Amino acid sequence: MIKTNVLRRAMDEIAARKGEFTLFALLMRADAPGTWDLVVSASWLESGNLKATREFVRLLAQSMGEESLHQFSRVVALDSNDAPVRFILENLPVEDDELRVQSTDLLGLQIQEAIIFRAKKPRPSPAALPNKALHPPAQKTRHG
């Protein structure tokens, strides 16, 4: 069995270095009992970007140990706009806890068990927020 406290620590260490995760979860598919998929989503971890996924796996191995990676049948990176991520964020939000779900259907994928460590929309980065210093409030003028 995967040591969830070790995985949580790895998640926290990687998030401190790279940025928050939108989703960090273990899923055991009904068609692959006894094996776990690690499913992650983060703004810095693009779906389909092998370089970013490779970097994530390297950081995971660095944090948990190379041998620990054999506990996962696969590591899946999803975009935050992907339907499964949006569904989990909307229906199973988790911030600093651990949510366990048994025997569920996740948008057509039969899940025997899920452990969700984080399912939270990321906070906007300071660069994405409007800078009030650059946009002062409109001045009222009197005509008269």
Residues covered by each model-derived region:
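Helical scaffold of the NTase/Pol beta-like nucleotidyltransferase catalytic core
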Residues: M1-K18
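Residues that form or flank phosphate/diphosphate-binding pockets in enzymes
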Residues: N5, P33, G48
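Short secondary-structure junctions
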Residues: E13-T22, G65-L69
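Short edge beta-strands and adjacent turn/loop segments
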Residues: G19-W36
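Short, flexible beta-strand-to-coil junctions
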Residues: L27-D31, S43-W44, D79, K120-P122
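Catalytic metal-binding acidic patch
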Residues: T35-L45
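Acidic, aromatic-enriched beta-alpha/helix-loop junctions
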Residues: W44-S80
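Catalytic "initiation/cleavage/transfer" segments centered on a nucleophilic residue
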Residues: E67-G144
